Amino acid sequence: CETEEERARTSELIRPILRGRDIKRYGYEWANLYLIATFPACRYDIDNYPAVKDYLVSFAEQNLRESGNNWVADLYLEDYCKQKLAQTGKFIEIKGKRIYIGNTAEKARKKTSNKWFETQDSISYWEDFSKPKILWKRVGSILRFGYNKNGALGLDSTCFATGNNIEYLCGVLNSPMGHYLLKDSPKTGTGDLLISVQAVEPIKVPQISQAENDTFKYYLDTNDEEEINRKVFELYDLSNDEKTYINENFR
């Protein structure tokens, strides 16, 4: 970016991204990865973000040269870019020759009403990414639900949930009680859990007040897992024997 004003404007588009492997209990270990998030609903004018535009366009020449198509990069780069961004879904041909990147024939992106720099499909819930949320790995042998409030996005190896009392829900899902509630989730052939949104939705979670959620938020901020687990057991009104069984088998 050439100016601080442009840098501040551009920062809206560049969002931290989390992979499934980054998700930890109650948090995450960010790998310093970013994603350019240009949601169609935001109606961005890419010319107001010249650094982002130059970065996106640079991949065309880079991909051509790395795949041995130097002649296209040297002589027909503009034609190649126009075809690539035409949103026709057609194969790209230069001087009657189909262009390949590796073993894959290059095609224009599919027909869509969105602009070339935007995601191909509209995302109606794009604003939810900016809200405090829970992220978790979709497939895994260990249950971990991370809490995020800095607007990070998640790869498709993750699921996320947002809404009211999200800190409380994060506590329930990470607790032994939460692991017990998810014990019958579908599994892969190798025994890994398939924790889709559909697997989480049916679990029974007691309703709480805003004040109680604030208590869970405090415990979450102070990493007080023992107090979270105790409070969750209290809300489910379990007997001592039931608590012992769950603690011994679902930590």
Regions found by a protein language model. Give the residues of each.
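Non-catalytic DNA-recognition/assembly elements of restriction-modification systems
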Residues: A51, Q207-R251
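Polybasic, glycine- and aromatic-enriched phosphate-binding surface used to engage nucleic acids
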Residues: C1-D214
